[in-house]
From Swiss-Prot:
InterPro entries: Amidohydro-rel, DHOdimr, Dihydroorotase_CS, Metal_Hydrolase. One of its GO terms (biological process) is 'de novo' UMP biosynthetic process. The keyword Translocase does not apply. CDD domains: DHOase. Zn(2+) 1 binds at H13, H15, K98, D247. The gene is pyrC. This is Dihydroorotase. Zn(2+) 2 binds at K98, H135, H173. It comes from Neisseria meningitidis serogroup C / serotype 2a (strain ATCC 700532 / DSM 15464 / FAM18).
Length: 344
């Protein structure tokens, strides 16, 4: 039986929620990943160092006994952010600030309305070597939802990089050929996280044969040519600029299957197996370890994990749902098969 042993991966983009939801989902990530970069879009958002440290304590308390998993904490960037907050965050071990353009995604109401007014804050981030994580979509209602990432590149990303050229930027959960091209052409201070869904699915998987609410995420799935461009990027010559970031975003089944369903896919349960499928299909299994376990750590300036995990070429059926607080959670590829399995 074929096996593949790799350095234990890190998830560089993860939503863990809070309370009972946190307790339900964190064990799935903790058994696969050594560390994860924790998104700050709680209600209310994680905007201060005190907020982040309190949230980290709640995550640690929710971990299974004996787990060595480490959450890497971030702050939610708001219009009120200051250079002083950046210095305070760096001193407290916060790894990054996250940009949510106001209204772009789940719990983004407190997001930034005009990033260019925060240039002094971004300059301080560059000075302190603290990362800037970007949800790269414009929220202009006149821009088609499928074009919002490409528009963001021209309107925001390129001008910001021109004004703060040494800022370390992660273009999060990229979905388009344009985003891949930007990262490929930018300096070594720009990298990207890529989700399993944007490497495996296209917008037909969301819309053909009926609306598939469990395939609805933001940024929304794009056409097949974009998916292929992402696979080419993560397996190509400059693959070191791309890394694993699941954007696993749990929402109760009832919140997904309704007239105005929430955006987000829960992939943490089988994340590494899903990525293995991508790299296997691309004939690039030898590049999975760098993508999952090395590139993110290098960009964040942290050491690689010292232990390993082993994948077995063995089919598994993903559960139709799992418990989630008072309700249930539908994982990515619920009821379907994945050709790999992590040995636990």
């Amino acid at each position: 039986m074929q096996t593949l042993t790799i350095i234990r991966p890190d998830d560089m983009h993860l939503h863990l929620r809070d309370g009972d939801a946190l307790k339900a989902v964190v064990p799935y990530t903790a058994r696969q990943m050594g560390r994860a970069v924790i998104m700050p879009n709680l209600k209310p958002p994680v905007v201060s160092v005190a907020d982040a440290l309190a949230y980290k304590a709640r995550i640690m308390a929710a971990l299974p006994e004996g787990s060595a998993f480490e959450p890497l904490m971030t702050l939610y960037l708001t219009d009120q952010a200051t250079p002083e907050l950046v210095r305070e965050a760096k001193a407290a071990g916060i790894v990054a600030f996250k940009l949510y353009p106001a209204g772009a995604t789940t719990n983004s109401d407190s997001g930034v309305t005009d990033l260019f007014k925060l240039i002094p804050v971004l300059e301080e981030m560059a000075k302190q070597d603290i990362l800037f994580l970007v949800h790269g979509e414009v929220t202009d209602p006149e821009i088609d939802i499928f074009d919002r990432e490409a528009a963001f590149i021209e309107r925001v990303m390129k001008p910001v990089l021109a004004q703060v050229p040494n800022l370390k930027v992660v273009f999060e959960h990229i979905t388009t050929a344009e985003a891949a091209r930007l990262v490929l052409e930018a300096g070594d201070n720009v990298a990207a996280s890529v989700t399993p869904q944007h490497l495996l699915l296209n917008r037909n998987d969301l819309l053909v044969g009926g609306v598939r609410p469990h395939h609805f995420c933001l940024p929304v799935l794009k056409r097949e040519t974009h998916r292929q461009a992402l696979v080419a990027a993560v397996t190509g010559e400059k693959a070191h600029k791309f890394f694993l970031g699941t954007d696993s975003a749990p929402h109760a089944k009832s919140a997904k299957e309704n007239a105005c369903g929430c955006a987000g896919m829960f992939s943490a349960m089988t994340a590494v197996e899903l990525y293995a499928e991508v790299f296997e299909k691309a004939g690039a299994l030898d590049k999975l370890e760098a993508f999952a376990s090395k590139n993110g750590a290098r960009f964040y300036g942290i050491p690689e994990n010292t232990d390993t995990i082993t994948l077995v070429k063995q089919s598994q059926t993903v559960p139709a749902s799992v418990p989630y607080g008072d309700g249930e959670l539908v994982p990515m590829r619920a009821g379907g098969e994945i050709g790999w399995m992590v040995q636990y």
